From Swiss-Prot:
It comes from Rhodococcus erythropolis (strain PR4 / NBRC 100887). One of its GO terms (cellular component) is cytosol. Mg(2+) 2 binds at E325, N327. Cell wall formation. Keywords: ATP-binding, Cell shape, Cell wall biogenesis/degradation, Cytoplasm, Ligase, Magnesium, Manganese, Metal-binding, Nucleotide-binding, Peptidoglycan synthesis. Its EC number is 6.3.2.4. Its main location: cytoplasm. PROSITE patterns: ATP_GRASP (PS50975), DALA_DALA_LIGASE_1 (PS00843), DALA_DALA_LIGASE_2 (PS00844). Pathway: Cell wall biogenesis; peptidoglycan biosynthesis. This is D-alanine--D-alanine ligase.
Length: 368
């Protein structure tokens, strides 16, 4: 490695049910890290939590047909030192080489989606280690991962959000009063999940308990949301090294079956495997509506005290935009909306990745 260049650890995989999506995102990031500026240390986390030196070959992290990639344990076992005096050392944990320093990294790009990665946990480790990292800090990551607290924080800032009921462990189902408040249809979701995994659209109350049980396979805390009727759009937010925060163009997701299939929604297979959705980037909205969405996206970013990046998802209703969710580490796959929106805004993928890394280094770690 050339010591004059920045060493970037790209961490991917992880213990969440979004393991494979993380791998695919990492493949795209590895393909777009500027080789003239960066040396890369790929670190994969297996589904059971083992850290290994991963492959730097992006093709090994691609979707093949409907087969999803994963991290296996074939690589060298490693740990990232949590001791800040070790300055980002990646240390071998393998056999006779145990204890050997394999690399010292300057910054981490945690391309991790879901639990044990996007929820403040990896961010806490990196804060302890004193290693700068791409994306929001511990608080924003934890709050952004939990749909209950995301909406509570956004609502406290006067931002428009939908109606939700939280079913904590031990609460089996909705009361009749809650059903009346929400109406039908509803969406039943794991409270701390992503990529639409574990989500069910319920059009009849007879299906509610099964949907709750399905969501609880992924999270003991469940959210039941009243359906919002409107166009589904997204907006990317990006922080620059000088601290400026800007919003991308707005993009719209169009489900081709939405008019004929009342149960159609943007689920995991639709996002990553079926290639049936249509996208308008930029969305075909009145300029005033797009400007309002972009303003709300930046306000949501700041309300959660985000840094680096986020993607904010909206429904455009007859009464105006409503924030559905905020994603603090959006997908970076070749079909992901976040890089596509920024490309349409005038920032290509490679420049986007460089901006995120530069912003992370400029921000540093610790209280700030």
């Amino acid at each position: 490695m050339n010591s004059s260049r920045t060493r970037v650890a790209v961490i991917f995989g992880g213990r969440s049910n979004e393991h494979s999506v993380s791998c695919v995102s990492a493949g795209s990031v590895l393909s777009n890290l500027d080789p003239d500026r960066y040396d890369v240390v790929p670190i994969g986390i297996t589904v059971d939590g083992s850290w290994v030196l991963g492959s730097s070959d992006p093709s090994s992290l691609a979707i093949s047909g409907r087969a999803l990639p994963s991290v296996d344990k074939d690589g060298t076992s490693v740990v990232l030192s949590a001791d800040p005096t070790r300055e980002g050392e990646v240390i071998s944990f393998d056999g006779s080489d145990a204890g050997a320093v394999l690399a010292s990294v300057d910054v981490v790009f945690p391309v991790l989606h879901g639990a044990y990665g996007e929820d403040g946990t990896i961010q806490g480790l990196l804060e302890l280690a004193g290693v700068p990292y791409v994306g929001p800090g511990v608080l924003a990551s934890a709050a952004g991962m939990d749909k209950e607290f995301t909406k509570k924080l956004l609502a406290a800032e006067g931002l428009p959000v939908g109606v939700q009921v939280v079913l904590r462990p031990g609460i089996a189902t909705l009361t009749e009063e809650q059903k009346a408040e929400l109406g039908l249809p509803v969406f039943v979701k794991p409270a701390r999940g992503g990529s639409s995994i574990g989500i069910t659209r319920v059009s009849n109350w007879d299906g509610l308990d099964g949907a709750i049980a399905h969501a609880r396979l992924h999270d003991p805390k469940v959210i039941v949301e009243g359906a919002i009727i409107g166009r589904e759009v997204e907006c990317g937010v990006l922080e620059f090294p000088n601290g400026d925060v800007k919003a991308s163009v707005v993009a719209e997701i169009r489900m081709p079956d939405a008019d004929t299939d009342s149960d159609a929604f943007y689920d995991f297979d639709t996002k990553y495997l079926d290639d049936v959705c249509e996208f308008d980037i930029p969305a075909k909205l009145d300029e005033s509506v797009s400007d309002q969405i972009r303003e709300l996206a930046v306000r949501a970013f700041k309300a959660l005290d985000c840094q680096g990046l986020s993607r904010v998802d909206f429904f455009v209703t007859a009464d105006g935009p409503v924030i559905n969710e905020i994603n603090t580490m959006p997908g970076f796959t070749s079909i992901s909306m976040y890089p596509k929106m920024w490309n349409a805004t005038g920032i290509d993928y490679r420049t986007l990745i460089s901006t995120l890394v530069d912003t992370a280094i400029a921000r540093g770690t610790g209280l700030r």
